[in-house]
C-alpha cells in the first residue's frame, strides 16, 4: 500500500527503521520545544494537495484538500493533545459529541430519534433547526481563539505553545503542474493537525456560552434539565417546543457566531434536503454494458452505506426480531 510522506518529504517508515535512535532524537526535540515554546519552522509547514470533487473544476469550492505535515511533528502534537484532553473533559458539556472518545454522530442521531419518539408518545410538538457553518474550520480567528482558550482556563504555557505554532505557519499547494511558493496562513485551524478538532470544539463552545443557550430556560425538559441543543463539532441542532422560541435560539446563535467570524451556511442546509443517494440510477442499472456483479457492487458501495447509516438506533418490534 502506498503511503504519503510528510510535508518535509520524510516517510514514516524511516522512523520505524531507526527505532531507538529516532526516539531519543524526537524526545530531545520535544523537550526543547516544551521548554522554549519555540517550534522548528519545518514543523509549521504543510503541503496542500487539491483533489477535485463533482462540478466545475475551475471553481475552488469544488475541491477537497489532502494536507501533508511532518511526521515527526505529530509526536509533539500527540503530547499536546493529551494535555488538552483534561480541559476538554472539564469544559465541554455532554451535548457536544464531536471528536470525543466513545462518542459519535450515531449517538446524536439516537438522541434525536428518542426525543421524537417521546414527543409522539406524549403528543407534544418539537421543533428542530439543523445548523451548519460555511467553512467553519477555515474561518477561526486566531486572536479570538487564544482569548477563548484563556477564558476556558487552559494554562498560559500551553496557550503560548499553540500561539507560537500558528505564528508564521506556511503552506504550499502541490498539483500535477508543479508547486507554488510558500505563503502564510492567517486564519483557520491547521488542516491535517490532530489538535484542530479539539481547538475548534473550544471555539464552538464559546459561541454557545456567549449566546446564552446554557442559561436560558428554553428547550426540552429531560430528566429535570433543559436541553436545547445537540452538537457534533460545528454541526448544531437546536430544539424547542415552540416555533417562536426556536427562532429566538437561532438568532442568538447567529449573532454569537458572527461575533467570532462564523456564518451560517444556508445554502448547504437547502442542499442537504434535496440530496439523493444516486442522481440518475437508471443509466447505470438499465445499461446492458454493465455486468450484474458490477451493478451489485455499486449498490453495496453507493446505496447500502446511505440507507443503513445509523441503523443501530432503529426500533425493531419483538415480532420482527
Each predicted region: which residue ranges?
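Conserved pre-catalytic core of RNA-dependent polymerases
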Residues: 1-203
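Eukaryotic intrinsically disordered and solvent-exposed regulatory patches
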Residues: 34-36, 113-117, 216, 223-225, ...
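Residues that mediate protein self-association or partner binding, especially
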Residues: 116-119, 130, 134-137, 233-236, ...
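Catalytic palm subdomain of template-directed nucleic-acid polymerases
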Residues: 135-152, 230-260, 275, 315-318
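Short, conserved micro-motifs composed of acidic
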Residues: 177, 264-275
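Non-catalytic, peripheral interaction segments enriched in hydrophobic/basic residues
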Residues: 274-321
Amino acid at each position: 500500500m502506498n503511503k504519503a510522506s510528510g510535508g518535509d518529504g520524510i516517510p514514516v517508515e524511516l522512523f520505524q527503521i531507526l527505532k531507538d535512535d529516532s526516539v531519543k532524537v524526537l524526545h530531545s526535540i520535544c523537550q526543547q520545544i516544551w521548554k522554549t515554546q519555540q517550534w522548528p519552522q519545518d514543523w509549521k509547514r504543510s503541503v496542500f494537495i487539491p483533489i477535485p470533487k463533482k462540478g466545475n473544476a475551475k471553481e475552488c469550492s469544488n475541491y477537497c484538500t489532502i494536507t501533508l505535515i511532518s511526521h515527526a511533528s505529530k509526536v509533539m502534537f500527540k503530547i499536546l493533545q493529551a494535555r488538552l484532553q483534561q480541559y476538554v473533559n472539564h469544559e465541554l458539556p455532554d451535548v457536544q459529541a464531536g471528536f470525543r472518545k466513545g462518542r459519535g454522530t450515531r449517538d446524536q442521531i439516537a438522541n434525536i430519534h428518542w426525543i421524537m419518539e417521546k414527543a409522539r408518545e406524549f403528543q407534544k410538538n418539537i421543533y428542530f433547526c439543523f445548523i451548519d457553518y460555511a467553512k467553519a474550520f477555515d474561518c477561526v480567528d486566531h486572536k479570538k481563539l487564544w482569548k477563548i482558550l484563556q477564558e476556558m482556563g487552559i494554562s498560559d504555557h500551553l496557550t503560548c505553545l499553540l500561539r507560537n505554532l500558528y505564528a508564521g505557519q506556511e503552506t504550499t499547494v502541490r498539483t500535477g503542474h508543479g508547486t507554488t511558493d510558500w505563503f502564510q496562513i492567517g486564519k483557520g485551524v491547521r488542516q491535517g493537525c490532530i489538535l484542530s478538532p479539539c481547538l475548534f470544539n473550544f471555539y464552538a463552545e464559546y459561541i454557545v456560552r456567549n449566546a446564552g443557550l446554557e442559561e436560558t430556560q428554553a428547550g426540552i425538559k429531560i430528566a429535570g434539565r433543559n436541553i436545547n441543543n445537540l452538537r457534533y463539532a460545528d454541526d448544531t441542532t437546536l430544539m424547542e417546543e415552540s416555533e417562536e422560541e426556536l427562532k429566538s435560539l437561532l438568532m442568538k446563535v447567529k449573532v454569537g457566531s458572527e461575533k467570532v467570524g462564523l456564518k451560517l451556511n444556508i445554502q448547504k442546509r437547502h442542499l442537504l434536503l434535496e440530496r439523493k443517494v444516486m442522481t440518475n440510477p437508471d443509466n447505470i442499472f438499465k445499461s446492458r454494458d454493465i455486468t450484474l456483479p458490477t451493478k451489485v457492487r455499486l449498490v453495496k458501495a453507493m446505496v447500502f452505506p446511505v440507507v443503513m447509516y445509523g441503523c443501530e438506533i432503529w426500533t425493531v418490534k419483538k415480532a420482527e426480531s
